[in-house]
Amino acid sequence: MEESQAELGVEPPLSQETFSDLWKLLPENNLLSSELSPAVDDLLLSPEDVANWLDERPDEAPQMPEPPAPAAPTPAAPAPATSWPLSSFVPSQKTYPGSYGFHLGFLHSGTAKSVTCTYSPALNKLFCQLAKTCPVQLWVSSPPPPGTRVRAMAIYKKSEYMTEVVRRCPHHERCSDYSDGLAPPQHLIRVEGNLRAEYLDDRNTFRHSVVVPYEPPEVGSDCTTIHYNFMCNSSCMGGMNRRPILTIITLEDSNGNLLGRNSFEVRVCACPGRDRRTEEENFHKKGQSCPELPTGSAKRALPTGTSSSPPQKKKPLDGEYFTLQIRGRERFEMFRELNEALELKDAQAGKEPGESRAHSSHLKSKKGQSPSRHKKLMFKREGPDSD
């Protein structure tokens, strides 16, 4: 191969040259500066020095100086585990009309499957779909002062969850389908069609609320209507997780002082009409009275007189005698012997009279007759010509 390349006058590639050929290609002038040359020469060892050192210590392998160990990095503080924020403050849910007669109202709607929002007066509960309009009417007996605001806040209804802040599930927080650019993604309650709405996160209680200025009713109207949206289903895992919630509506002045308070339960579901009809039927079956608006406790008390056990039937009176007319001597003798045998059996066993009558009626039912049960029979002897 080399001869063929030499004949053709082709030089081998650079990688095929010897080290001496490559060393000759280096420039003769010293690349190191004059200042660094002495120091570098002191560090270099000649081949004779290396051979002498190995002869003196053949058992010892050359050891390279260990580089200094890098300083151990300061361990970073562990990130706090993500958990639901807890609040030490539980807002009151007691109805307070105040001096302005503040109370809420809702539009009348049925339980059809097509409804997106319906209110049950018997349950004081609003059933609605996700992100659908929920009109809430604000009624006052006299106009509140200027600068009055309306605040809406959600809390859990059951006492074991009241300290937990109500917020949306992680899935709906990341979902951008219902984002309006105004409300924070973790807020459950939004106000529809009001650019003056303020979404607040309390630094002390960590609770979410939405505040809008109170507007007096329009001409020809007796109430003010605010359209709310609930942005997460009640069944969402990681959010409400099937835990009932209450929405508290408060009327406040410009300084935050309370002027009135009212509340109602909310269920966000796929079919509000069906769920309302089902819960109302269960409510009436249990015989519960209409619940008052939530006070100190959100649970309804069951009536003490309600009992699930069926009423017991009255037992027939003991010691009654009945006359049974039987046609035919042969049949009469058969029933008479049967009755005497039962009486004798009861006398020998020492049973109670009620038990003997029950056993006697059971035997008579097997014979195809239908006399009154639990009755003692008394027969009247008749002649062969009687009917």
Curated annotation (Swiss-Prot):
Cofactor(s) recorded in Swiss-Prot or TrEMBL: Zn(2+)
Motif ([KR]-[STA]-K motif): 364-366
PTM annotation (N6-lactoyllysine): residues: 113, 132
N6-methyllysine found at: 364, 366, 376
Region called Interaction with WWOX, residue ranges: 59-103
Basic residues composition bias: residue spans: 359-378
Motif (Bipartite nuclear localization signal) on chain: 299-315
Cited InterPro entries: p53-like_TF_DNA-bd_sf, p53/RUNT-type_TF_DNA-bd_sf, p53_DNA-bd, p53_tetramer_sf, p53_tetrameristn, p53_transactivation_domain, p53_tumour_suppressor
PROSITE patterns in alphabetical order: P53 (PS00348)
Residues carrying Phosphothreonine: 18, 278
Residues annotated with Omega-N-methylarginine modification: 327
Record field: compositional bias (Pro residues): 64-78
Source taxon at top rank: Eukaryota
Residues where Phosphoserine is found: 15, 20, 33, 37, 46, 176, 263, 309, 386
Protein residues bound to Zn(2+): 169, 172, 232, 236
Record region (Interaction with CCAR2): 1-314
Single GO MF descriptor: DNA binding
Keywords linked to the UniProt accession: Acetylation, Activator, Apoptosis, Biological rhythms, Cell cycle, Cytoplasm, Cytoskeleton, DNA-binding, Endoplasmic reticulum, Isopeptide bond, Metal-binding, Methylation, Mitochondrion, Necrosis, Nucleus, Phosphoprotein, Repressor, Transcription, Transcription regulation, Tumor suppressor, Ubl conjugation, Zinc
CDD domains referenced in this protein's UniProt entry, alphabetically: P53
Associated pathology: p53 is found in increased amounts in a wide variety of transformed cells. p53 is frequently mutated or inactivated in many types of cancer.
Protein name, as recorded: Cellular tumor antigen p53
Organism from which the protein derives: Delphinapterus leucas
Gene that specifies this protein: TP53
